[in-house]
Amino acid sequence: MTLYQLGNGKKFYTLTFGCQMNEHDSEVLAGMLDQMGFEKAASEEEADLLIINTCAVREKAEQKVLGKIGTLRYLKENKPDMKIAIGGCMVQQEHVANKIYRDFTHVDIIFGTHNINRFPQLLEHVMQKGKRVKEISQDDSQVFENLPHKREDSIKAWVVISYGCDNYCKYCIVPYVRGQQRSRDPEHIKYEVEKLAKEGLKEITLLGQNVNSYGKDLDQNISFTNLLEELSKIEGIERIRFMTSHPKDFDKELITTLKESNKICEHFHLPVQAGSNKILKKMGRGYTREHYVDIVNDIRAELPNASITTDIIVGYPGEEEEDFQETLDLVQNVKFDSAFTFVYSKRSGTPAAEMAEQVDEQTKKGRIQKLISVQQEISEQRNKDLENTVQRILVEGVSKNNEDMLSGRTRTDKLVHFPGDKELIGELVDVKITRGHSWNLYGEIFEDSLT
């Protein structure tokens, strides 16, 4: 039996934890399995192969994964021929991979982030020889092109422009599990986007741990803004998004590029992490509070309707009440459209995990609750400010909240629910906003847009 016949008559199911990069990797795994003859299962119980794509950014995510792996023991007892594979950032940490291999003997395959291309061969080994395998590569120098994708979404797609990160923020595990920055060749990116356009997709989101530093590791002279300009020329693609931006490498040229484009969406995900210069320095972020505020002011001066979202960590080692108040003050002054807020979580192997002055859990809990309360009020007001305006929406599908409604996003990445015909899915329509809430908007189709 050849490699590309192994999956004939078999089904797979993937559980994905973590960020958009992991979602992209799961699409790659699905593409490989599709080529091998596997079909997607409707549930874990139906699967012959179960893959867990893991996240290592916070301890809570790791504990959740370990708990899930434990429960799969009973599933495999009832279906002994099922194969279980664990991949992603969590098992790129060798001590974690070894623990899972040792403690969870029902797991058949363990593979890391740097050898996802080898998954078909690892699966073949297990299926034909019946032996478990653990393979974690430490070679973070390669970029694998032409890997297959199996995308579920026919409207929008993730497109990776770079892998890894060179920043080594003191709290962050990502450079250790994703490796050094490797920018993809712009021609390969362009080819992928052109292919997506031919398939009828309308929107792409460019992914990188730090999109602003794209190209700095390439021999050719190309910047992120150069890449955006080239991709904007591709016919069929209506919207281009990107994430994540790093304040240290952000420049005004990006703002100008957005202002001059009718395709690149006016949304900046710009993680600030803290509002205290003392904490920013301890984090190794490479910028000050003042520099960050200057970026925000530059964006709003040129693109007043742009949305700005962020990430914030509370309870970082050494964070005193005064530091936290500076973060609250920044939030209240910048008025982010939304914020992903996190309690600091120790990551083994990072400098921050060894720092003195670790903040106690009760203090962290009080601070995160206060921050969420402040930001939620701001988010609600930012969305209420859009009431009675008409927004251009890319209709993504039936609303998850109400199957009688459609949902889609504004150019500024606001989720909007509204009544409409399912034939509009995949189309751009104008919607008049009637209600704004903290996390979403409601509206009705602006009839003039359908005539």
UniProtKB/Swiss-Prot annotation:
Enzyme Commission number, as recorded: 2.8.4.3
Cofactor: [4Fe-4S] cluster
Subcellular location: Cytoplasm
The keyword Metal-binding belongs to this UniProt entry's keyword annotation: yes
Domain spans labelled Radical SAM core: 151-381
Cofactor note: Binds 2 [4Fe-4S] clusters. One cluster is coordinated with 3 cysteines and an exchangeable S-adenosyl-L-methionine.
Signal peptide boundaries: none
Any one GO molecular-function label of the UniProt entry: N6-isopentenyladenosine methylthiotransferase activity
Family per record: Belongs to the methylthiotransferase family. MiaB subfamily.
Complex and partners: Monomer.
Name of the protein: tRNA-2-methylthio-N(6)-dimethylallyladenosine synthase
Organism annotation: Natranaerobius thermophilus (strain ATCC BAA-1301 / DSM 18059 / JW/NM-WN-LF)
